[in-house]
C-alpha cells in the first residue's frame, strides 16, 4: 500500500482515538455529555443478554439483538469497546471504498482524495466515537457492493441478507441488484424471464435464507417483541417531534384524527416512485444507483434525522470521481446543504431549549431542505459520467 494511503488511514485512526479521549473527559467533567444516549441503550441491552434476559427489557432498544450481542464486551471488558468497534468500522469502510474506487478505474491518488472525504469527515468521526452504530451498516453495504463488483455473488448475497437484518433500508437495493445481475446474461430474453436467471435466483435464495434464518432464531428466542421492536416499529413509526422531514408537521397536526393512519401509504408514494425511476435509469452502475436510492429514501422519508445522512454519505466517495462538477460548484452545493441544515437548526433550538412555538418555521425550513436536497441530487445526476464497464 502506498505511503499516502498509510498516512491517510493513520491520521484517520489517530483523530478517532483523540475524539474518544475527548469524549471520556467530557463525560466525566461536563454537564453536556459526549456519548450518544443510544450507546447507553445498546450497552444496557447487552447487559440484559448477559443475564439471560431479553434485550428488549431496555426501553427504546429497537434494533436486532445481534447489535446487543456485538456489544457484550462492553459489559465484561470496557465501556469503550463499542466505540472502538464503531471507529474501526469507520476505517474499514474507508478501505472498502478504496478497493471499490480502484476496481472502478480510479487512480490511487483520486481514490485517496475520495476516501479522505469520509475518513477525515467530522460527521462520521463524531457519530462513531459518540457510540452510534451506523458505521457497522456502512461496512455491510460497502462489502456487498464490493463483492458484487468482484462477481462474488454468493458472498454478496450473504452480506445483503445480513444488511437487511440489521436495518430495513438496504432492502431498497433489491431491485437495482436484480437488474444489475440480469443485465448481462439475460440480453435478448423477455422482461419477465430476465428475473429467472440462475445468478439472480441464487442471490435471492441465499440473501432470503440469511435474513429469514436470523429472524427465526431471534423470534424463537424473544418472540413477537423482536418483530415489533426490530422491524414493525420502524415500518409504522410516526415521529411527531420535529425532524428534517417536512412530513413530520403533517403527522403532528393530524395525529388525533381518526383517518391519520391512512396517511402512511400516501407518504410512501413519492419514495416508491422515485426509487423505481432510479432503478430503471441507473441500475447499470450499481454503486451510483444505490447512492441515489439511499439519498432519495432519506430525503423523502417520513422521518429524517442527521444520522440518516451517513447512509448515503458512505456511498458518495465511491461515485465522486465520476462526477464532472467543477470544484467551485461542488463547494457551493456543499455550502448550500450545510446552510439549510443551519436554517433548520435555529427554529429547532428555539423549540427544544427555549420553549418557543416554532413548528411552522421548522416545517418551512424542512421544505426548503427537501427542495435543496432535490436540487443537489439533480445536479449530481446531470454531471455524472455514466458507468464504463471497461473501467472495471
UniProtKB/Swiss-Prot annotation:
The chain crosses the membrane at residues 5-25, 66-86, 126-148, 157-177, 199-219, 262-282, 303-323, 331-351, 361-381. The gene is pigm. It is a multi-pass membrane protein. Disulfide bonds: none annotated. Part of the glycosylphosphatidylinositol-mannosyltransferase I complex that is composed of PIGM and PIGX. This is GPI alpha-1,4-mannosyltransferase I, catalytic subunit. Its EC number is 2.4.1.-. The lineage of its organism: Eukaryota, Metazoa, Chordata, Craniata, Vertebrata. Catalytic subunit of the glycosylphosphatidylinositol-mannosyltransferase I complex which catalyzes the transfer of the first mannose, via an alpha-1,4 bond from a dolichol-phosphate-mannose (Dol-P-Man) to the glucosaminyl acyl phosphatidylinositol (GlcN-(acyl)PI) intermediate to generate alpha-D-Man-(1->4)-alpha-D-GlcN-(1->6)-(1-radyl,2-acyl-sn-glycero-3-phospho)-2-acyl-inositol and participates in the sixth step of the glycosylphosphatidylinositol-anchor biosynthesis. It is found in: Endoplasmic reticulum membrane.
